[in-house]
UniProtKB/Swiss-Prot annotation:
Protein name: Phosphate import ATP-binding protein PstB 2
GO cellular component, as recorded: plasma membrane
Compartment list: Cell inner membrane
Example GO BP: phosphate ion transmembrane transport
Keyword Membrane belongs to the record: yes
SMART domains: AAA
Membrane topology (UniProt): Peripheral membrane protein
Organism annotation: Synechocystis sp. (strain ATCC 27184 / PCC 6803 / Kazusa)
Ligand binding (ATP): G45, P46, S47, G48, C49, G50, K51, S52
Length: 266
């Protein structure tokens, strides 16, 4: 449950008692978090704290890692996404993902957007879908006259927005972003941040970022993860504190959160 203005609401995505293992190594322990609808939620914390690992559980990308194992319960609109009846590919149509490094397909700009829609048997006007998706990603004006050009011909920032447009085109409800600006210049980063403000009117966004200033600028809620050493030097990540971004940055409840957001470690 998420509490906003004193009112509790059920999250679009919820993790309950989630543990994530890679082989015998516990990477994330006992995570409980609720992601509210049409908000931006930022995951922050030092390297190795499990924020990207948990993010990838939300659309079962960790299924692609043979030694990964998830315990506990993760629900999407109340339904267990790890239930045997759930098709991971179909789930990823509803819960899209944008990765740290832009990864356009080796196709034209147009086909980068249209490809996923075709695979999902889109029956509408493809030209309209491509234009709408590119407009939502704030890229249309820059590429409208070269839609047949390769996606690789774009700058790094444009490629990342192309990947966002590609995710939008399959009409998800949730967009997961794993450090989408880490390889971008400041101007491209600001464009992506502005885009997130616009996209949350229609989409729920969860972003992993090492940039605390970015988290404070773009998110409505912030989750702070930390890492601790356990037996024989192994490290495990966990969720320390979660709440409205203003509270996390200005009046955190936990000392470790205060130390991290003030730059004392990380």
């Amino acid at each position: 449950m998420v509490v906003s203005n004193g009112v509790a609401t059920k999250g679009v995505l919820e993790a309950q008692g989630v543990n994530v293992y890679y082989g015998s190594h516990l990477a994330v322990k006992d995570c409980n978090i609720s992601i509210p609808e049409r908000r931006v939620v930022a995951f922050i914390g030092p390297s190795g704290c499990g924020k990207s690992t948990l993010l990838r559980c939300f659309n079962r990308m960790n299924d692609l890692v043979s030694i990964a194992r998830v315990e506990g319960r993760i629900t999407y609109h109340g339904s267990d996404i790890y239930a045997p009846s759930v098709d991971p590919v179909g789930l990823r149509c509803s819960i899209g993902m944008v990765f740290q490094k832009a990864n356009p397909f080796p196709k034209s700009i147009y086909e980068n957007i249209a490809w996923g829609a075709k695979l999902n048997n889109f029956q509408g006007d493809m030209d309209e879908l491509v234009e709408t998706s590119l407009r939502r990603a704030a890229l249309w004006d820059e590429v409208k006259d070269k839609l047949k050009a390769s996606g690789f011909s774009l700058s790094g920032g444009q490629q990342q927005r192309l990947c966002i447009a590609r995710a939008i085109a399959v009409q998800p409800e949730v967009i997961l972003m794993d450090e989408p600006c880490s390889a971008l210049d400041p101007i491209s980063t600001l464009k992506i941040e502005g885009l997130m403000h616009e996209l949350k009117e229609q989409f729920t966004i969860v972003i992993v970022t090492h940039n605390m200033q970015q988290a404070s600028r773009v998110s409505d809620y912030t989750a702070f993860f930390n890492v601790e050493s356990v037996d024989r030097g192994a490290k495990v990540g966990s969720l320390v504190e979660y709440g409205p971004t203003e509270e996390i940055f200005q009046n955190p409840l936990k000392e470790s959160t205060r130390d991290y957001v003030s730059g004392r470690f990380g």
